[in-house]
From Swiss-Prot:
Lineage: Eukaryota, Metazoa, Chordata, Craniata, Vertebrata
Record PROSITE patterns: PH_DOMAIN, REM_1
Protein name: Rhotekin-2
Protein's gene: rtkn2
CDD domains from the UniProt entry: PH_rhotekin2
Domain (PH) ranges: 285-392
Keywords associated with the record: Coiled coil
Cysteines joined through disulfide linkages: none
Region listing for Disordered, in residue ranges: 483-530, 574-612
Length: 612
């Protein structure tokens, strides 16, 4: 008896936890309203004033909503104390699990006249527009959008999420509009008070000023239900239900409440496009967890495997240990629990002394049965209650419980510069057959930059084909060159320059039946300097010929490279090469005849010798 008195005393003197939460929210909104009122008194720009008035409307709507909740809860508590007993109330009545409802991508098309849409853009009339969303005790708003005659549709990029929605929810969307070209929009309450003080007499003005400073500013602000100057009016509205949810963009019909002659009027098309999704808690939260024993028949013998089972996301996930869940290990067994699943209690087993139940699923037209057993009857009752609640949640959320829909809860307020774009026309998104959202060019370029790690901006780098002589330097080939003639000595080497000058002599004239062989030798003859361009072309040709010969040798079977012989043994190597080749005698090069000087050419004795 003392316990009952204590409970009654606590319920009467101390408020419930829900009441405290609502009271805290109410106090917060009141403080927000006070701050907005102070901001309104100093606002001078149109957009600042309109944004402040919008926030003030949302605060007032939330205050009214929280006040109504407190009154209703107080009324329920009073009727509960004086009315019928709690045992008379149906405690066994089931309620579907809550869920999340999110709306995003709101686009409302406009239907301008051709004369209005293509008229002078500088003198066009602008409107401030925003949406207020109501679902149960929650109220949210979108960003304020400035609309003029150049826009084809109104776009709101906000993602609004309602975290505690019931299956029979009603989401109400209200579209408010205000004309920005109204001359009275800049008349804030402070300016209006100054004009009123100046319009009356001097003595009366001082008296009015003292009374205005003595009273609180919010008392003056809320003397009328609407703020003077800037005033939003309801332009259109729509109510969404569970049947309106679809995991894609969908077109809905609007109810237009404004009149064409109103200053806040906008030529709405009569429809809107948005993405409305829902996530029931039965697909995201863990409904039940605990140990179960799976029963199997192996070779006519009954065996049991102990699992730690979790009922989540429409599946019964079976793990060996609870630690596997935190380690994100794949479950050892997954049993679907959907609308087509049948669960039956098997009864108490005398051998195992445990209660069992069977889970029956139809796979490819055949019934697949899994038998589980609990440790005690109380555990079995908890599992059966969780299964019945899960089936009830699936039936109440209908098509939303078949597949988990994705909610993008993060929406950047100020996206990066390369992601900003002007809103496209809503007609690209409003498709009856397969509605889809088109991707802009900036999004494609941004994705390409991320995929190629910035190489997309530089451009494709064309890899040129390697030169034929590039294989000489890759280090994968062994080169063996047999030299049949002594190497040409460079005049740049100081050690060999003296020997070259000492051994330099005139070459004998070529035989009459042999063609002359051109051989480039560096020297200081002035005649060589005159033929420098012709020799450069010969050098290029000879270099290409050598490269082709070397590449041809690389294609043959590789031989072990030999160390080059010293210059004294070159002649011996040449003789051995002639003996090995046999009949194939190499053609010896013929030196080029020495060019005659001008004095020798003009000598008459040389003419006589040539005639002989």
């Amino acid at each position: 008896m003392e316990i009952k008195r204590k409970k009654i005393r606590e319920s009467a003197l101390f408020p419930r936890e829900d009441d405290c939460l609502i009271q805290e929210k109410l106090d917060f909104e009141i403080r927000m309203r006070d701050g907005i009122c102070k901001l309104l008194s100093v606002s001078s720009q149109k957009e600042q004033l309109l944004n402040a008035v919008k926030n003030l409307m949302v605060c007032n709507a939330r205050i009214q909503n929280y006040t109504a909740q407190l009154r209703s809860q107080m009324g329920e508590s009073n009727t509960g104390n004086t009315g019928r007993r709690s045992s008379d109330v149906g405690l066994n009545e089931r309620q579907a699990c809550p869920g999340k409802v999110a709306i995003s991508g709101i686009r409302i098309p406009l239907m301008w006249k051709d004369s209005d849409h293509f008229s002078n853009k500088e003198k066009t009339q602008r409107h401030s527009v925003f949406c207020m969303l109501r679902l149960g005790p929650e109220i949210h708003d979108t960003d304020m959008v400035i609309v003029d005659k150049t826009m084809t549709d109104i776009c709101f990029d906000n993602v609004t999420v309602f975290a505690d929605a019931r299956s029979d929810f009603q989401l109400k969307l209200e579209l408010y509009s205000c004309c920005m070209e109204d001359s009275s929009i800049a008349n804030t309450p402070k300016k209006l008070a100054r004009k009123l003080r100046n319009s009356i007499g001097k003595s009366a003005g001082k008296k009015f000023n003292s009374e205005l400073e003595a009273t609180e500013p919010e008392a003056f602000l809320f003397s009328t239900p609407h703020m003077p100057g800037a005033r939003y009016s309801l332009l259109a509205q729509i109510t969404f239900t569970l049947d309106s949810i679809e995991d894609n963009f969908r077109t809905h019909s609007l109810t237009i409440t404004g009149h064409e002659d109103s200053s806040f009027w906008l030529p709405l098309y009569g429809s809107m496009c948005c993405r409305l999704v829902a996530q029931p808690a039965c697909l995201t939260d863990e409904a039940m967890m605990g140990f179960l024993n799976q029963q199997e028949m192996v070779g006519g013998l009954r065996s049991y495997t102990k699992f730690y089972c979790v009922l989540k996301g429409g599946n019964l996930l079976c793990y060996y240990t609870p630690e596997e869940i935190n380690a994100k290990v794949e479950p050892a067994l997954t049993v679907p629990i959907n609308k087509e699943t049948r669960i039956r209690a098997v009864g108490k087993d005398s051998k195992s002394r445990a209660s069992s139940f069977s889970v029956i699923n139809v796979v490819s037209g055949e019934a697949v049965t899994k038998v589980f057993s609990a440790d005690c009857k109380e555990e079995l009752q908890k599992w059966m209650e969780a299964f019945w609640q899960h089936f009830y949640d699936l039936s109440q959320w209908k098509h939303c419980s078949e597949k988990l829909m994705k909610i993008n809860e993060t929406s950047p307020q100020k996206p990066p510069l390369f992601l900003t774009r002007e809103p496209a026309s809503v007609y690209h998104d409003m498709s009856i057959g397969s509605p889809m959202k088109l991707e802009s060019i900036t999004d494609i370029i941004h994705n390409k930059i991320e995929e190629t790690d910035g190489q997309f901006l530089i451009g494709p780098q064309e890899e040129s084909a390697p030169a034929p002589w590039a294989a000489l330097f890759d280090g994968n080939h062994q080169l063996h060159v047999e030299r049949n003639k002594p190497p040409l000595l460079s005049s740049d080497d100081p050690s060999t320059s003296s020997n070259v000058k000492a051994k330099k002599r005139r070459a004998p004239p070529p035989p009459p039946n042999k063609t002359p062989f051109s051989k480039l030798v560096e020297g200081n003859d002035p005649s060589d300097k005159e033929n420098i361009w012709s020799r450069a072309s010969l050098v290029r040709k000879s270099f290409d010929t050598k490269l082709s010969a070397i590449m041809h040798q690389l294609q043959r079977p590789m031989v072990v490279p030999l160390t080059p012989a010293p210059p004294e043994k070159i002649e011996v190597t040449e003789n051995k090469a002639e003996l090995d080749t046999g009949t194939q005698e190499p053609i010896k090069p013929v030196p080029t005849p020495r060019q005659k000087s001008l004095r020798e050419k003009l000598d008459p004795r040389v003419w006589l010798q040539s005639q002989v």
